[in-house]
């Protein structure tokens, strides 16, 4: 078997191609999830085969298997290692059809693998972006979403692949799945860290990836279905259910509005990764600053408290793509008072825009005991421990 590491690709090439090394343990996970649905007549396809980690695992399963690969060196290694398996040297998002892979209309067809994925609009921070060339009906901002749409176009009976968890748990991303979400239902899923991939271990922050098993289904799935779905966590007894996690969605503004007032602001925040990585309180940033006023000050002080102190000991990656965490304790006047006091004593910009007298007029005499704040923080940090 080929040692499946992308040693011939630069980091830029890895990003452009969406190429990552899939560890055997992750391939085994996919195999265990889909194995019960493979029959002697099943045909198995691996799109974006890399060096053949999934081909190796599934080569003796079902009736036959095939792979596809765009990268020249990977393709040549695949055809050398697997001369009896059809390997297509192609961009699999062009001219998508069952005929191309010798699939009849009624063939039992299962897709497995770790297809390329990357946001083609924001891959490179210095302006260079990936190029996605594909059939018009599978166009997406993300390679991975285009592959999911391609699997739907191929009418796969089951799909068991690795992809970013954000495709499912971020509502906008989920809606972008198009016909895939209308024709497939999630049956089983296990979350793991992107740092399980050798080629991106050195990235600054990891993000949640999911091994997901989907079944072709006339009803499909809704975002509410995903919110109530119980995800497994790799190497953990804990479970993840989106509906059980309190976030700021629908409560606190995350993106700037037009005609934002200048003055005290909070830097725009997409998710927990953005909150922890970017600035907190800022001033006079009309394009990327959220207006802070007397009514929402305690909410942004809470987010600033999170930013400064949130350090879970395990499974940190699960939080990354979630909207910033919220707590109903913010509705309690005493808890609110302590959050304001913490911000006043730790953030210079708060002291610049708010005097002690004004804050005490709004929230009462400020407390200096923060134990309750850190107890609530500890509860949130331990959600997935």
What label would you give each PLM region?
Residues 55, 118-122, 167-172, 221-222:
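Short catalytic/ligand-binding loop motif for oxyanion handling, primarily in non-cytosolic enzymes
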Residues 1-79, 85-86, 91-96, 350-385:
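Class I S-adenosyl-L-methionine
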Residues 118-140:
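Mobile active-site "lid"/loop adjacent to the S-adenosyl-L-methionine
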Residues 91, 111-118:
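Amphipathic alpha-helical repeat scaffolds
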Residues 139-197, 212:
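Conserved Class I SAM-dependent methyltransferase catalytic core
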Residues 204-260:
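Flexible, glycine-/basic-rich loop-and-beta segments that form/coincide
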Residues 94-107:
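Short amphipathic alpha-helix with an adjacent loop that forms part of the alpha/beta core around
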Residues 265-385:
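C-terminal target-recognition/interaction regions appended to catalytic cores
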């Amino acid at each position: 078997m080929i040692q499946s590491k992308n040693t011939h690709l630069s980091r830029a090439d890895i990003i452009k191609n969406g190429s990552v090394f899939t560890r055997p343990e992750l391939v085994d996970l996919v195999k265990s999830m889909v194995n019960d649905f493979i029959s002697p007549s099943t045909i198995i396809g691996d799109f974006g085969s890399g060096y053949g980690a999934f081909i190796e695992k599934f080569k003796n399963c079902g009736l036959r298997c095939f792979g596809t690969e765009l990268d020249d060196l990977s393709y040549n290694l695949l055809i050398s290692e697997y001369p009896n398996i059809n390997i297509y040297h192609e961009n699999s998002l062009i001219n998508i059809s069952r005929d191309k892979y010798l699939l009849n209309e009624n063939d039992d067809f299962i897709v497995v693998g770790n297809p390329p994925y990357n946001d083609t609009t924001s891959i490179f921070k210095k302006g260079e972006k990936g190029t996605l060339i594909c059939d018009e009906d599978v166009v997406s901002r993300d390679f991975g979403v285009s592959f999911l749409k391609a699997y739907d176009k191929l009418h796969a009976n089951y799909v068991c692949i690795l992809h970013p968890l954000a495709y499912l748990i971020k509502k906008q991303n989920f809606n972008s799945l198009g016909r895939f979400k209308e024709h497939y239902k999630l049956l089983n899923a296990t979350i793991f860290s992107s740092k399980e991939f050798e080629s991106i271990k050195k990235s600054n922050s990891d993000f949640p990836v999911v091994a997901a098993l989907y079944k072709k289904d006339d009803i499909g799935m809704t975002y509410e279905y995903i919110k109530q779905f119980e995800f497994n966590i790799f190497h953990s007894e804990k479970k993840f259910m989106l509906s059980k996690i309190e976030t700021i969605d629908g409560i606190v503004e995350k993106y700037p509005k037009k005609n934002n007032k200048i003055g005290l602001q909070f830097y725009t925040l997409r998710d927990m990764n953005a909150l922890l990585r970017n600035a907190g309180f800022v001033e006079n940033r009309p394009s990327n600053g959220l207006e802070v006023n007397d009514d929402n000050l305690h909410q942004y002080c809470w987010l600033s408290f999170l930013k400064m102190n949130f350090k879970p000991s395990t499974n940190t990656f699960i939080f990354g793509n979630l909207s910033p965490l919220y707590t109903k304790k913010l509705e309690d006047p005493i808890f609110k008072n302590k959050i304001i006091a913490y911000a006043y004593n730790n953030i210079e910009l708060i002291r610049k825009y708010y005097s002690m007298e004004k804050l005490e007029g709004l929230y009462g005499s400020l407390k200096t005991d923060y134990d309750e704040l850190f107890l609530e923080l500890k509860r949130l940090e331990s959600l997935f421990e």
